[in-house]
Each structure stands twice: as structure tokens, then as C-alpha cells.
């Protein structure tokens, strides 16, 4: 059986293979002779990093899981300054974390080709917003490439390295959830000899303070350079292999479609049976090439711009048309929604309205049927996995702090604690935000410990923040230092499942593992003690009583308390046991002891436990039970009993 990693490394130019969009990006990086790759995982970009981790050593590429996107960007940047081709990848909100360095470096330029892959998430399938990276790139004057197919996802990477070096500027490769996760045919290109041999590349850094030091005197002359450079990219994109005009030359109407919208437009026109439309396919949404625009607009009377999210291309086209006195009817966001991802239906409706034709399908009728079916479907909210240690931690927190407490939380699997029956998440905003919000609430509601006028005793509001291990290292550290320094009065529970679970079980500083060998493990409790936390403890959440008692004790402490709740992610651990051919414990309900009180369902909420309406007893699905024993600990009647021994 051929593995994906083998395909990504295949030395078979011209061979057609099936790859995920994110895997194709890795192949493109290898064909482009990448030297250094650094990233923090974030859906929908995670498979880029995971695939690179699996092939890097064999290809002679240095690859790391960085602690956050800013660090990853700076790692890749410095490799570029040393003359190596480098790449970083992140989800769209990850660019916010890297923005400080990103914006400054736009003035400074690069040496070796530098690619910043940013995976946007229209419709917010796994994100807190759907910000459009193209708009940020326009703000920063950084060029953007956007693939319309898996083949382009690969080919654009090599091209991006080349133009990045040609003009001395980093390039953004903007993908979306769909282009990241779609599969398609890819014709492989040639691998460089160094990649074939797995020869590690080392750079050479030449000191140049005027370029690399960002004091105002050095930076001031660079702003004109930045503006001149983006215009050079605009000229370059007039002949880019990823931009072209298709359709009849005598067409009176035209459609501009950047990135994946091109594929949707082609499908929409096929549905509508229309072929007398000229199309400008754009693989470079910023900057839009004016020379190509001029050719495209020749002879047209009306133009529609079909793009996801923000009117980035539309605004550029309209400004160009106005500046050149081109009096043509231009439509965009008046027909194409500004929110959520592009779909074939959306493209069909927009194009049909633009052309004044009927859609081939009665979408309203489908909507009405969908509503009726939706009413019949039982609610299926997401849930923490069976045996998830976070469930036990949340249960203990809620019991110790009581529901009257305030529970700021963070970004990770544990965000699901917002749902019943746990309901132990009151706020989330961004990575590391739990500790900052907890501190702010503590100051606003109770006051700092150093203040004379502060609330104490029963007047004091209990605030318990929850944050994951990877998130703690990502952006939790500055917030913890701030809370300790400013004498906050909060409990911070670090839910350490010993892996970056939500994005695909990647390592982090708390695991001590790296793709290129053993790393240095950093223990969260040691960091908390070194920072000066007033109370620090480590618990095993599979022991709910111990966890509850420790949290109760921590809540009595004046100051910042840190409790590390450490137990391996159940999904990750079960995978290990399966690969080792080992079994895990299983629990079942003793019907004679079960009183039907439903505490296991209404307060604990493990998905392996269900209600037998006929017998009015709780049941355990043996195929879902992973044997953590939490149910046996929360049941007041001892109705849950272990029926199979095993490891966990």
C-alpha cells in the first residue's frame, strides 16, 4: 500500500496522483527546494504542517512545530534572511498573532523566497470569525496567490518562491477550507537534487543593519520601496500562468473569478447552459493586474465579480475603471453575498440574476423541504469524546466552584464545555484569552489584592479560567505573568491532555517531542511556580475526588492559583493502545443498583451513556466506552461497574 508521504516524495515527474490540497502545497514546497518550514497547527491549514513533519527529515528540510504563529513566522523569516527558501502556514486568525512582525517585515524585504500560507475559513467551520486574508494583504501591500484547484495549489508554491526572490518580498498563498481539504489530480514536477538526496541546507547571514534593524531612520525610505514593489508584482501578474481570459472575444458580458470562485463560476455556467460569457480567471487577487483587466474589459458592456467574503477584487476593479474613465456596469457584492463560503448554488443564483435568466433548480422549494426535514432530525450537538479528561475536570470545577462562578475559557476541544450538561464555559475570544479575561473580570468585579477597597469573603466573585496545554504555551504565558504581576485573584486550570489535540495530535513544548528528534520538555507547573503563582498543583482528572478537592483548596487561596489537570487525550491514547494490540477497560450498568436518577446523563454527559426509556435505566454502549471510570465516580449508587480490565 502506497502512503501519502511516499507520493509527496515520489521522484516521478509527469506522474498523475491524487492529493489533498494541503498535501499538494507540501509537494510544491519540495519542488521549490524549501529549506526551512515552521508553523503552529490551525484548521484548515494543519495537514500542511503534519505532512511536512512526515517527509521533512527524508527530504533534508528543517521543520518545526512552533509555539505560535508569530514565532513560526519569525523562524521562517530569519531562514529567508540567511538565504534559504522558507515557508510558514497558519489559519487566518493565526495571521493576527503574527501581524506585529508581518507588518514590519513588509517594509524590510527578504532574501531567500518566503511564503506565508494562510488558510481562511469562510462560513467559520472551525473558527471564531471569517476574516479575509486578501484584505489584510492589501492593507500590508503584500501580494497574494489563490489556487482554483489542487494542481494550482502545488504549482503556485514553486512560482511563489521564484517571484518572492525576484522582487525581494514575501508572498501570501491564500487558501480556504475547501481548497485546503478538497482532493484532486496533481501532475508531479521535478524534485531538486538536494531534496532527492535529503541533503540539509544551511544558510549564510550577512550583517546589514540598514535592512534588518527597524529603527525609523532605516525604515522611512523603505515605504516607497514597498509601494514600488507591489506595482512590480502587479506588472508581473499580467503574464502570470495562473491568470487568463477565456470565452468568446465578442462577448458583451464578462465574469471575474478569483481563486476557487473560478471553479464555481464554471460549474454555474454549465448548469445554466450558457457559453457566451467571457471569464477572467484570477490566481492573483492582489494586486489585480491592470494590463489583463484592460484586455478583458475590451468590448464588454457588463461585468460581474464573483468572490468569497470581502470585495477585495471588486474594489480594485472599480477604482481602476473609475481612474481610466471606463463607463461599464460592474456588479459584485450587490449580487454575491459578503458572508459565508461560496457554493455552486450561490454562484448559480448570482450569475442567473446578473444575466436575467431563470435558475435550473427551484432553490426555494428545496429550502422549504429542508426546513421540514430539519424539524424531524433530532438535535445532535457536538460533545467531548468518551473518556475525555476535560469532562472530568469540568465536572470537578463546576462542583467545587458552583455554577455561580464565572468561567472564562479558551480555544480548543474544551470549548465544548459551553454546552449542557457541563456548562462551564462563559467566555472565549482567542488563543490565550481565558487568562486575560479572567484577570480583567477579577479586577472589575473584585479588585486587585493590593487595593484597599476590594471585595473579600462571600462578596468576592469566584473566577475560574480554563486553558489547554498547547494554548498555554501559545499565548497564555504573557497573560499569566500579567495576572501574577498585577495581583489578580483567579484560579487558572490548565487542561493538559499532553498533545495539541483539536488540530490533530501535534506535539507542543509540554510533550518534549519534535519532528526531528527529542526536544526539551517544559512542565507547566514549573513555569507557573517560576512566575510566582501563589498556589500550584497537579492532578489526574481521572481521579475526580482528588481533582475536586484540589480545586476547592485552590479557591481558598488569595492570589493566582494554577491547577494543572494532566491526563493524555483519550482519543490519542486509544489510538496508541489499538496500534499496540492492547485493550482498555469497559464499564457497564448494574441494573439492580441503578435508580434512574440520571445524574450520569444530566450532570456528567458522557456520550457512551444513554437512557433506556423502557427500563428507565442508564446504559453504556460498550463500543463507545473507553474506560475512564468517571461514570463510576459520579454515580451516587455505585451502579457503574468495570466489566473488562485494560490499560488507559
UniProtKB/Swiss-Prot annotation:
[4Fe-4S] cluster 1 binds at residues 594, 597, 600, 635. Coiled coil: none annotated. Its EC number is 1.2.7.8. GO terms for biological process: organic acid metabolic process; sulfur compound biosynthetic process. [4Fe-4S] cluster 2 binds at residues 606, 625, 628, 631. Heterodimer of the IorA and IorB subunits. This is Indolepyruvate oxidoreductase subunit IorA. It comes from Pyrococcus horikoshii (strain ATCC 700860 / DSM 12428 / JCM 9974 / NBRC 100139 / OT-3). The gene is iorA.
Amino acid at each position: 500500500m502506497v502512503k501519502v508521504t511516499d507520493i509527496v516524495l515520489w521522484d516521478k515527474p509527469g506522474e498523475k496522483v491524487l492529493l489533498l490540497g494541503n498535501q499538494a502545497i507540501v509537494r510544491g514546497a519540495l519542488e521549490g527546494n524549501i529549506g526551512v518550514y515552521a508553523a503552529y497547527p490551525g484548521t484548515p491549514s494543519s495537514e500542511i504542517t503534519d505532512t511536512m513533519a512526515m517527509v521533512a527529515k527524508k527530504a533534508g528540510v528543517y521543520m518545526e512545530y512552533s509555539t505560535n504563529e508569530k514565532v513560526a513566522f519569525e523562524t521562517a523569516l530569519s531562514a529567508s534572511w540567511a538565504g534559504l527558501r522558507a515557508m510558514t502556514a497558519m489559519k487566518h486568525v493565526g495571521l493576527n498573532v503574527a501581524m506585529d512582525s508581518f507588518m514590519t517585515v513588509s517594509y524590510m524585504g527578504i532574501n531567500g523566497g518566503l511564503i506565508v500560507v494562510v488558510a481562511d475559513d469562510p462560513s467559520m467551520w472551525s473558527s471564531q470569525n471569517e476574516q479575509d486574508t486578501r484584505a489584510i494583504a492589501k492593507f500590508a501591500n503584500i501580494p497574494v496567490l489563490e489556487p482554483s484547484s489542487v494542481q494550482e495549489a502545488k504549482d503556485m508554491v514553486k512560482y511563489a518562491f521564484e517571484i518572492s526572490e525576484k522582487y525581494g518580498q514575501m508572498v501570501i498563498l491564500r487558501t480556504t477550507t475547501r481548497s485546503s481539504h478538497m482532493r484532486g489530480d496533481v501532475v508531479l514536477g521535478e524534485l531538486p537534487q538536494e531534496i532527492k538526496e535529503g541533503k540539509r541546507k544551511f544558510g549564510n547571514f550577512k550583517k546589514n543593519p540598514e535592512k534588518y534593524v527597524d529603527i525609523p531612520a532605516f525604515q522611512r525610505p523603505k515605504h516607497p520601496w514597498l509601494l514600488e514593489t507591489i506595482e512590480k508584482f502587479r506588472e508581473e501578474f499580467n503574464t502570470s500562468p495562473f491568470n487568463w481570459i477565456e470565452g468568446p472575444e465578442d462577448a458583451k458580458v464578462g465574469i471575474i473569478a478569483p481563486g476557487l470562485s473560478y471553479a464555481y463560476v464554471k460549474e454555474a455556467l454549465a448548469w445554466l447552459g450558457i457559453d457566451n460569457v467571457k471569464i477572467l480567471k484570477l490566481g492573483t487577487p492582489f494586486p489585480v493586474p491592470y494590463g489583463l483587466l484592460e484586455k478583458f474589459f475590451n468590448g464588454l458592456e457588463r461585468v460581474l465579480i464573483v468572490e468569497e467574503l470581502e470585495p477585495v477584487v471588486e474594489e480594485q476593479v472599480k477604482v481602476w475603471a473609475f481612474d481610466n474613465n471606463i463607463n461599464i456596469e460592474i456588479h459584485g457584492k450587490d449580487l454575491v453575498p459578503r458572508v459565508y463560503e461560496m457554493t455552486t448554488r450561490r454562484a448559480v443564483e448570482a450569475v442567473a440574476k446578473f444575466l436575467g435568466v431563470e435558475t435550473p433548480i427551484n432553490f426555494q422549494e428545496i429550502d422549504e423541504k429542508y426546513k421540514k426535514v430539519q424539524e424531524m432530525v433530532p438535535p445532535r450537538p457536538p460533545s467531548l469524546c468518551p473518556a475525555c479528561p476535560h469532562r472530568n475536570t469540568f465536572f470537578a470545577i463546576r462542583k467545587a466552584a458552583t455554577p455561580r462562578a464565572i468561567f472564562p475559557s479558551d480555544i480548543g476541544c474544551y470549548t465544548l464545555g459551553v454546552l449542557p450538561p457541563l456548562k462551564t464555559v462563559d467566555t472565549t475570544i482567542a488563543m490565550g484569552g481565558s487568562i486575560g479575561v479572567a484577570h480583567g473580570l477579577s479586577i472589575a468585579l473584585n479588585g486587585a489584592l493590593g487595593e484597599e477597597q476590594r471585595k473579600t469573603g462571600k462578596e468576592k466573585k469566584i473566577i475560574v479560567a480554563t486553558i489547554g496545554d498547547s494554548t498555554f504555551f501559545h499565548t497564555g504565558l504573557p497573560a499569566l505573568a500579567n495576572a501574577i504581576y498585577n495581583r489578580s485573584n483567579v484560579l487558572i486550570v490548565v487542561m493538559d491532555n499532553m498533545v495539541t489535540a483539536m488540530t490533530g495530535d501535534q506535539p507542543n513544548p509540554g510533550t518534549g517531542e519534535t519532528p526531528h528528534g527529542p526536544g526539551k520538555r517544559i512542565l507547566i507547573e514549573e513555569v507557573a511556580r517560576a512566575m510566582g503563582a501563589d498556589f500550584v498543583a497537579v492532578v489526574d482528572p481521572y481521579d475526580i475526588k482528588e481533582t475536586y478537592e484540589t480545586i476547592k483548596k485552590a479557591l481558598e487561596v488569595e492570589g493566582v492559583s494554577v491547577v494543572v489537570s494532566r491526563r493524555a487525550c483519550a482519543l490519542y491514547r486509544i489510538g496508541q493502545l489499538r496500534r499496540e494490540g492492547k485493550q482498555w477497560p469497559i464499564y457497564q450498568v448494574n441494573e439492580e443498583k441503578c435508580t434512574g436518577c440520571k445524574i450520569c446523563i444530566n450532570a456528567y454527559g458522557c456520550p457512551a451513556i444513554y437512557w433506556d426509556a423502557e427500563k428507565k435505566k442508564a446504559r453504556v454502549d460498550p463500543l463507545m466506552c473507553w474506560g475512564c471510570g468517571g461514570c463510576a465516580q459520579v454515580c451516587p449508587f455505585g451502579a457503574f461497574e468495570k466489566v473488562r480490565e485494560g490499560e488507559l
